[in-house]
Swiss-Prot record:
Residues 60-98 are annotated as: FliD binding. Belongs to the FliT family. Keywords: Bacterial flagellum biogenesis, Chaperone, Cytoplasm, Repressor, Transcription, Transcription regulation. One of its GO terms (biological process) is protein folding. InterPro entries: FliT. Pfam families: FliT. It is found in: Cytoplasm, Cytosol. Residues 1-50 are annotated as: Required for homodimerization. This is Flagellar protein FliT. It comes from the Bacteria. GO terms for cellular component: cytosol.
Length: 125
């Protein structure tokens, strides 16, 4: 990036993408989050080849520092939300595995006929 304002604009674009990704994570829109991550990574790659020169004004450096801090905070929050989702999925997988093991071991129990038989036997007493 040749222009310092272009660099600032690139940082602001990454911030915008970061905020959108955080909103997607908060709303549990995981597929959209994954799709947006590709765009986000491409934007990060653009600035990774750039550097802030020593001639960059202090106020511009401060703006970029503030933007980076917000981006990092957003990333940490996204990671927490992703970990929470991973834990939920792990729990569901464990439950499904246990259910499959029970079904394999004992066969699948028909819920309704058993329930009706149980209800009929208690009504007759």
């Amino acid at each position: 990036m040749d222009n310092k304002m272009d660099l600032l604009s690139a940082y602001q674009r990454i911030l915008s993408l970061s905020e959108q990704m955080l909103n997607l994570a908060k709303n549990e829109k995981w597929d959209e989050l994954v799709d947006m991550e590709i765009t986000y990574l491409k934007a990060v790659e653009v600035i990774s080849h750039s550097s802030i020169s020593s001639t960059t004004s202090l106020s511009l450096q401060q703006k970029m520092t503030n933007i980076l801090q917000i981006i990092l905070d957003n990333e940490n929050e996204i990671k927490k939300l992703l970990q929470k989702r991973l834990d939920e999925l792990s729990k569901l997988i464990k439950q499904a595995s246990q259910q499959q093991l029970l079904n394999d071991s004992y066969g699948q129990f028909p819920v309704e006929p058993y329930h009706n038989t149980l209800m009929n036997s208690t009504e007759q007493k």
